[in-house]
Amino acid sequence: MRTTTRRLPPAPAAAAVLLAALTCLLLRPAAVAAAGGHAADRIVRLPGQPEVDFDMYSGYITVDEAAGRSLFYLLQEAPEEAQPAPLVLWLNGGPGCSSVAYGASEELGAFRVMPRGAGLVLNEYRWNKVANVLFLDSPAGVGFSYTNTSSDIYTSGDNRTAHDSYAFLAAWFERFPHYKYREFYVAGESYAGHYVPELSQLVHRSGNPVINLKGFMVGNGLIDDYHDYVGTFEFWWNHGIVSDDTYRRLKDACLHDSFIHPSPACDAATDVATAEQGNIDMYSLYTPVCNISSSSSSSSLSRRRTRGRYPWLTGSYDPCTERYSTAYYNRRDVQTALHANVTGAMNYTWTNCSDTINTHWHDAPRSMLPIYRELIAAGLRIWVFSGDTDAVVPLTATRYSIGALGLATTTSWYPWYDDLQEVGGWSQVYKGLTLVSVRGAGHEVPLHRPRQALILFQQFLQGKPMPGRTTNVTVA
C-alpha cells in the first residue's frame, strides 16, 4: 500500500491468497454441511465466549456453482425480547476486507477479541441489541469466503461482488425462511460505500418481495471520486498534514482520476503526501499507532488503522486490535465452532484483508450518485454518517459528495446530543437523505464512539432524526 487513497481500509501483509484458491476444493464441504437448513449453522459456543441471551449462526452459501464461489456469513440475532427485530446486513470494504474481522470483531458486533486471541468479551454497545445483524465476507477470497476458480481472486470488481451478494441473499432467505418479508436494511462503511448502494439497487430492481428492503446506511464511504478527492485533500491541508505545494500537486494530479485506479502522476503525488504525513493513523488522526513488533512483514508494521476501546482498558486506547482477531480466527477450535475450514485443509494464515484482491480490483464506477438519486426517488430510507477525525474518507469529502446531489434541506445543520446530553456530532436532514457526523470518531465510527454509534443506529432504524438537546435518549 503506497497511498492512503486506494485501500479502504489497508490490508495487512498479503496472505497466500492463491494457496487459498488452490485448497478450496477441500474446503467445499463447508457449503455442503450447511445446506441442510439453518439449524446446522447454529453456533453452540465460541471459544472463550461469555454467556449470552441471543443465538448465533455461521456458515457458507454457494453463490456460483460452476465457479465454486461460496461466501461466509455470521449472524448475531437480537435477544428474544427484542424480536421481531429488523434484519441488517453489514458490509466492510477494502476492497478485500472481512466484515467478520472488522464489523463483527472490533466495531458493532457482539464481542471484542482479547489480546493474543485468548477469548471474547461482550460489547456493551453491540448492535444486535436492537436488530438481527448479518455479517458477510465478500467477495470470494475474503476472510473465510472462498472460490474453486483461482482466477476469481484476480478478477473481482464491483459488478460481480454485487451480483454474488444478491445471490447470497436470495439463498440465505431460503435457509432462514422466518426472515422472509422481515424489515431489511443494508449498511456498511469505507469501500462498502460502493457495495451498499450497488446491492441495494439490485434488490430494489429485483422486485423480490421476500427481501423487504427499507433502506441503507453508509459510514465514511466512497461516494463520488471527484468530490471525495476534493474533500479529502482539503481536509489534509486544513489539518496541516500536507504542505501547500503538495496540496496543489494533489489537486492538479488527482481530481479527475479514479479513487481505486489512480494515474501514475496521482500515485506520485500521494506518495509525497504520505511521506509528509509521517507515521500517523490516517483512519483516526488523533489516536496512536500499534508499535507491537510482528513477524508477518514490514508492511504490517506500518499499517495505519483505527483500533478498539476495551472493557479492561477503561479510558485508554488499544491500537493493536487487528493482531488479536488474526490470532483468534486462526485458532482451529474457533474455525470449528464457526463451521469454517471444516476439513482443516486451510494451510494459509487467515487475514483481515486480502492484498491480492485489493491490488487486482477491476471495475469500480467513479460515482454512486446516480444510484443515490434512483433509490431516493424510490422512497428508501438513506442515511450517511461520518466520523470527523477520519482522514481517508473525511467528513469534508462526504459533504461535498452529498452536496452534489442538490437535495432540498428540510432541517439545517444542528448539533445532536447523546444520552448524557453531550454533543455527539452534527446532522442535516435533506429531502430523501439524512447526513450525520460523529464527533471524535474515526473511519470506523462504532469502534471509537460505540455509545454514540448505537444511538445513531437506533435512530436510523426508527426513522427518527438525531436527537436535539431537549430530546430524551435511551441507549439499548
Curated annotation (Swiss-Prot):
Lipoprotein recorded as keyword: no
Keyword Metal-binding: no
Annotated GO CC locations: extracellular region; vacuole
Broad enzyme group: hydrolase
Annotated S-S bridges: 97-353, 254-266, 290-320
Pfam families for this protein: Peptidase_S10
Gene Ontology BP terms: proteolysis
Propeptide residue interval(s): 295-313
Alphabetized SUPFAM superfamilies for the sequence: alpha/beta-Hydrolases
GO molecular function: serine-type carboxypeptidase activity
Signal peptide: 1-34
Keywords (A to Z) from UniProt: Carboxypeptidase, Disulfide bond, Glycoprotein, Hydrolase, Protease, Secreted, Signal, Zymogen
EC assignment: 3.4.16.6
Modified residues annotated as Blocked amino end (Thr) in this record: 314
Subcellular location(s) of the protein: Secreted
Active site: 190, 390, 443
Top-level taxon in the UniProt lineage: Eukaryota
Subunit: Carboxypeptidase II is a dimer, where each monomer is composed of two chains linked by a disulfide bond.
Protein name per Swiss-Prot or TrEMBL: Serine carboxypeptidase 2
Species for this entry: Hordeum vulgare (Barley)
Biological classification of the source: Eukaryota, Viridiplantae, Streptophyta, Embryophyta, Tracheophyta
